[in-house]
């Protein structure tokens, strides 16, 4: 589990390799990840946009931006959480993801809540010890 806090917004990510949707012979590797966004502040906030940075095992970077998450722009009152599950596929057996959610508080102030860097690992990763 990976976690980061920005302005009292805690983002926790739990990635999971999905072998049923992966095929090493065809260089297709799929992960699901569950994200929990917890509003630990004293203000109501809304998630308005996402910006993901996905890097595969060869260092190739893909950026994904758009409104909200899974078709929603959730509003979180103080103490509330929002959880969703999504997925990502790579052509390499490992990679990393990170990014930020654009948040706006009840006063109209915008800020980026950091998504922690998290590792996408599969059983097909070849470990090398130096």
From Swiss-Prot:
Domain of life from the UniProt record: Bacteria
Ranges for domain ApaG: 3-127
Gene3D superfamilies per the UniProt record, alphabetical: ApaG domain (2.60.40.1470)
Alphabetical GO biological process terms: error-free translesion synthesis
InterPro entries assigned: ApaG_domain, ApaG_sf, Uncharacterised_ApaG
Protein name as catalogued: Protein ApaG
Organism field: Methylocella silvestris (strain DSM 15510 / CIP 108128 / LMG 27833 / NCIMB 13906 / BL2)
Classification of source organism: Bacteria, Pseudomonadati, Pseudomonadota, Alphaproteobacteria, Hyphomicrobiales
Gene giving rise to this polypeptide: apaG
